[in-house]
């Protein structure tokens, strides 16, 4: 009888463990985000809100009938964004004549709804009351017009890069492997940030901060790396959290190889110092090196190999760390760490 009870306890604990790991692995897509913190007093920040829109992705004929299906077309919708700008109140309340104490650091956070959801009043207050020598950062949350943490279809397009051109490749939208949703809109999303979101931010601030940073997780981490490899001048600091290196059989490895071939990628040729922070979970899916079927492309790298190669290239300007956490858990951990390191 005792043995039976022990077996039942073991089975129950195992089932609980599975349920917990599953809950951490899958993002919450059903619980509305509480935005009340943005209107609360005593956070040390004043928030300004604005909306943006991007046109529907174009799906040109590519010889692949599946791209012309009604299912694919149903994902080709305009994207609607909500952007919250958090301005520290304390430095702006004094405004010295030489502007020495005005905030000169700003961070753009992807998946802005979820990022807001993972912060609280105490964290914002602590950020806003940095020392005069280390002014409080300006916060930009780039989210979607949804009551939930994520718009999974919109981010799947916005955050994923176009495929590097090959004989059969294209820089246009394409369907994600094994799914109907669209990928490949990172360059369009980059242009939206540079040409619409950033100018609006500068207008609200009345100045352009000297040090700009960007943070993203998962597909957002891919976008951070894409921006670094294609537009390294866009930011001074890049925070890529558990980037989906497995995506498209390691397409980001190909971008990394192409970046290395650019003369301006070498530290001696860079006009400014670029800092990169990589954080990784112990997710089995991304720990295993993916296998590619093309013989003429670079072999995709594991997370460890990718981090070592990239940080060797950037020398003292790059750091990486593995956390004993799930992919989902690392979202908040990496976000808070990035904010604390500004």
Locate predicted features.
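C-terminal catalytic histidine-bearing segment of alpha/beta-hydrolase fold enzymes
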Residues: 279-342
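Gly/Ala-rich beta-loop-alpha elbow adjacent to hydrolase catalytic centers
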Residues: 216-220, 224
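Alpha/beta-hydrolase fold nucleophile elbow
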Residues: 206-217
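A domain-start/cap signature at the N-terminus of enzymes
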Residues: 25-105
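Active-site nucleophile loop of the alpha/beta-hydrolase fold
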Residues: 144, 239-247, 283
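Conserved hydrolase catalytic core segment
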Residues: 226-236
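Residue in the alpha/beta-hydrolase core beta-strand immediately N-terminal to the catalytic nucleophile
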Residues: 213, 237-239
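Active-site machinery of serine-nucleophile hydrolases
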Residues: 113-182, 186-190
């Amino acid at each position: 009888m005792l043995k039976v009870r022990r077996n039942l306890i073991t089975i129950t604990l195992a089932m609980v463990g599975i349920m917990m790991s599953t809950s951490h692995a899958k993002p919450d897509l059903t619980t509305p985000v509480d935005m009340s913190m943005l209107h609360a007093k005593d956070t040390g920040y004043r928030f300004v809100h604005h909306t943006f829109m991007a046109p529907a992705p174009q799906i040109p004929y590519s010889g692949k009938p599946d791209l012309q299906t009604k299912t694919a077309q149903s994902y080709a919708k305009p994207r609607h964004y909500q952007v919250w700008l958090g301005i520290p109140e304390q430095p702006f309340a004094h405004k010295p004549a030489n502007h020495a104490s005005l905030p000169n650091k700003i961070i753009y956070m992807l998946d802005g709804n979820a990022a807001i959801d993972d912060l609280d009043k105490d964290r914002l207050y602590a950020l806003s009351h940095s020392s005069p020598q280390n002014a409080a950062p300006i916060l930009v949350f780039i989210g979607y017009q949804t009551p939930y943490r994520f718009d999974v279809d919109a981010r799947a397009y916005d955050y994923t890069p176009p495929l590097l051109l090959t004989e059969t490749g294209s820089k246009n939208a394409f369907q994600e492997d094994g799914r109907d949703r669209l990928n490949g809109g990172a360059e369009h999303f980059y242009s939206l940030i540079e040409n619409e979101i950033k100018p609006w931010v500068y207008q609200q601030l009345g100045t352009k901060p000297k040090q700009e940073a960007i943070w993203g997780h998962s597909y957002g981490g891919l976008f951070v790396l894409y921006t670094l490899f294609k537009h390294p001048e866009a930011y001074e600091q890049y925070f890529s959290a558990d980037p989906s290196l497995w995506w498209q059989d390691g397409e980001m490895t190909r971008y990394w190889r192409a970046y290395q071939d650019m003369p301006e990628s070498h530290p001696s040729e860079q006009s400014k110092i670029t800092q990169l922070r990589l954080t990784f979970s112990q997710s089995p899916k991304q720990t295993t090196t993916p296998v590619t079927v093309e013989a003429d492309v670079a072999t995709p790298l594991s997370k460890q190999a990718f981090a070592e190669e990239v940080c060797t290239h950037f020398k003292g300007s790059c750091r990486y760390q593995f956390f004993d956490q799930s992919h989902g858990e690392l979202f908040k951990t990496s976000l808070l760490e990035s904010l604390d390191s500004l």
